[in-house]
Amino acid sequence: DVYKRQFLFRLNMTGLTQPLVDLLENPAVIKVGLSLKDDFMMLHKRAPFEQHSCIELQEYVRMFGIQDKSLQKIYGILFGEKISKSQRLSNWEAEHLTEPQKQYAATDAWACLNIYNRLQELKVTGDYELEPDEPLTNQESLITNP
């Protein structure tokens, strides 16, 4: 089950291996994330590859009237819950990551996947309304139908 298993790749230690390049280039595997442009810019410095089937959530959420670009805010709008980002600025180059760092990395990936899946559900059900005449704010960006 994709929700129960996450993998943390320490690219600073392993480099960008061929199996990871194959995954990034595989059009059958959807890659979902936030600020992917920055991630791919860093990955391209490690090895040449052509990524396929990537969903940039900062752009994708706009189709649903969400203007916010932070993972915390997007997650809060869709699920009414808060996720912790306290480990974001910690030392990711350390030889050993702390448990909170590992939890942060897993939560970050899990939240992106949940956001994407929720938006896919809304796309299918049409259970949202856009109000283009009014400026969109954090909690008003996505209004679900009763």
Q: Where do the language-model regions lie?
A:
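A short alpha->loop->secondary-structure connector
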Residues: 47-55
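Short alpha-helix plus adjacent loop in nuclease-associated cores
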Residues: 55-77, 101
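Short, small-residue-biased leader/transition segments that mark boundaries at the very start
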Residues: 2-3
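Acidic beta-strand-to-loop metal/phosphate-binding motif
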Residues: 29-36
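Short, basic/hydrophobic alpha-helical segments
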Residues: 14-28
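Short active-site loop/helix that positions an aromatic residue
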Residues: 39-46
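Acidic, Mg2+-coordinating catalytic module of metal-dependent nucleases/exonucleases
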Residues: 76-136
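Intrinsic disorder
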Residues: 140-141
